[in-house]
C-alpha cells in the first residue's frame, strides 16, 4: 500500500522518502517449488527528512489565521530556516493520498477563498508601505539622500496637474525620513520619488529578493514583480511615467510580492546578510550584502519606532518585556480611488463599507529581538484593512510564542 508525495516537500523528496523495493530471484522445479535462492536485493527503507518547521508555531499561525485568508511566514535570521509557512485557508492534504472524491475536488475548486493556492509562496500582493523600507534604504545608500531632510506633508503632493494623496487626509506636517517610516507618511516618499530613477530602485530591490526568486527549496514559488522601464515597454508597450515611480515607492502600482519575499526582505534588512530561505535542515553561512552599517542601523531604529513609540503605526502591537520587536505596517490597496471620492465631504469610503473583494489587504512585517535578530515574520490578511489593525496583532502573538519558547 505505497503512498506517494503529490505536492510540496513530499513530491520533491518522494524518492528519498519512499526508498526502494527489494526482491529475491529463486530457482523452482516444474511444480513451482523453490529449490534455491539465486539472487537477492535488499529493500532500502525511505530516509527521514529533517525540516526547520516548528510544529507549535505552525499550529499557532493556523489558529491565528482561522477565518482569515492570507499567509504567515517566519524565517530564522541565523540559519535561514523556515520556522513557519502557513497559507490560509488550507485543506487536509492527507485526503489526497488515497484519491480524493470528485465531489470534494469540485468543492475545493469552486471555493471562492481558493484553499488550493499556497499563498505563502505563490500569493501575489502589492507590499504597500512595507516596501517603504527599501525605498528609504535605497535613498540613503545609493542616492546620497540626507536622512535628516524634512518635507511638509499637507495631505498630498502635486506632479503636474495630478495630486498624489497621503493616507492621512489632513497630512502629517513637517517630517524627516525616520518620522516618515514611523508614521508611514506617503507624501514624504512621493518627494523622494521626484529624485529617483526607477531602474536603480528596481535593481536595489532585487538585492532583497523583491521581484526575484528567493531560492527556497520547495517547488511552485512565484517570483513576483518589480517593474522598471524595460518591463513597461515589453508588457504594456508604453514608456515609464514619473507618476508610476510615485506609486512604486510606496509599494503600490504594478509591484507584486509574495509573503515569503516580504519575510526574507525583513530578514536581510535585519541582518545585512544574503539569507537564502530553506525548509530542509542544513547548516549554512551567508555572505554580506555590503550595505553600509550606519544606513542599516538607521532603518532598524526607524522600524523600532514604528512598534515602540506612541505615534508609531504599530504601537498597539508592541511587545512587553526585554525582547523588543521592530516592524513596518502596510496597507495594500486593491482598488483605484477616484478624485471624486477623495473630494467627497465624508472623504474616502471606509474599508468596512466596501464589498469584501474591494477591501485593502492588511500587512505587517517584523523581526525580533531588536538587538539580536533571530526571527523575521511577515503576515498578510486579505481584505482586512490596515496593517496595524489585523496583521500586526497576529504577528505579535506569533512572535511572542517564538520568543518565549524558541529563542
PLM region spans:
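Conserved, well-ordered alpha-helix/loop/beta-strand core segments that scaffold catalytic motifs
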Residues: 31-71
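Short, gly/Ser/Thr-rich active-site loops of penicillin-recognizing serine hydrolases
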Residues: 286-290, 300, 394-407
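Carboxylate/His-rich catalytic cores and anion/metal-binding grooves
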Residues: 3-27, 69-97, 201
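Amphipathic, well-packed alpha-helical segments that form the structural scaffold of globular domains
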Residues: 14, 18-21, 62, 66, ...
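Beta-lactam-recognizing serine transpeptidase/beta-lactamase-like catalytic domain environment
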Residues: 28-38, 78-129, 134-379, 384
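Short, charged, low-complexity patches
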Residues: 6, 262, 387-400
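Short amphipathic C-terminal alpha-helix that caps PH/PH-like domains
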Residues: 9-13, 269, 394-402
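Short, well-ordered alpha-helical scaffold segments within catalytic/effector domains
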Residues: 54-58, 362, 396
